């Protein structure tokens, strides 16, 4: 290894090696994409990063994060999760490791959160301009007959999330079906009604369009990521007893807002 390092150092060629900015990791059910690589010591990073995971049955360390989407613009989280505190922290299973700690479908998640589930991911496209993937997430819920999520994003900061779920039995009016953890410690602005809602916070907008009447609300949630260790969660609940829900969510990131 040392001799190889010296050989590389003495070889003629470019002074830097280009690093890949995107990759799919089938063994982990995960796609990682960046608009650019930046030095870790960069004082003001500006790259957009998108991470999507379905999870696999062979994992040894898991949370109920099947379908999780994380978006980071420079230093600013746009879509996030609750993170991982000490495993013995109060509320670890319910507030962090479980489905509630992630931007995923919320109805009857398989428990415990540490139980791996065989959720599949198909990469439809992946290149420097963005990507598009689809996931089958039904096995992560005890009640879902079908549960799919498609995610498409571009380097311009547009993320489109297409969710569809059907249940083996109707769920009650007021049941939360989806949620999104967003990178704002302050309350967000919510407007709309029925099947059409819009959400805005510093650095991003979110448009939610459903196939039936829903209620969109927010709440403050703890996290183990960075100070102040709290952020807002957007919740989407059905307005009447339902056997499923289709929800299209479009997030537009302000690429200039990096911190």
Predicted region positions:
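Extended polysaccharide-engagement surfaces of secreted carbohydrate-active enzymes
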Residues: 1-259
């Amino acid at each position: 290894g040392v001799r190889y390092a010296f050989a590389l150092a003495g070889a003629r060629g470019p002074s830097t090696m280009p690093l890949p900015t995107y990759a799919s990791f089938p063994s982990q059910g995960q796609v990682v994409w960046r608009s650019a690589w930046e030095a870790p010591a960069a004082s003001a990073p500006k790259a957009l990063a998108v991470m999507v995971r379905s999870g696999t049955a062979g994992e040894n360390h898991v949370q109920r994060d099947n379908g999780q989407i994380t978006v980071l613009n420079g230093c600013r989280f746009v879509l996030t999760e609750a993170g991982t505190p000490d495993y013995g922290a109060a509320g670890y299973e319910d507030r962090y490791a479980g489905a509630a700690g992630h931007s995923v479908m919320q109805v009857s998640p398989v428990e415990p959160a540490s139980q791996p589930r065989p959720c599949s991911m198909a990469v439809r496209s992946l290149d420097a301009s963005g990507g598009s993937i689809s996931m089958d997430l039904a096995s992560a819920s005890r009640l879902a007959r079908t549960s799919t999520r498609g995610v498409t994003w571009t380097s311009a900061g547009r993320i489109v999330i297409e969710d569809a779920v059907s249940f083996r039995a109707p769920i009650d009016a007021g049941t939360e079906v989806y949620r999104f953890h967003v990178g704002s410690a302050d309350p967000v602005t919510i407007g709309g009604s029925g099947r059409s809602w819009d959400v805005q916070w510093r650095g991003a907008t979110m448009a939610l369009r459903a196939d039936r009447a829903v209620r969109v609300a927010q709440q403050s949630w703890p996290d183990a990521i960075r100070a102040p260790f709290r952020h807002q969660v957007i919740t989407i609940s059905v307005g009447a007893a339902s056997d499923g829900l289709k929800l299209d969510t479009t997030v537009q990131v302000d690429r200039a807002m990096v911190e």
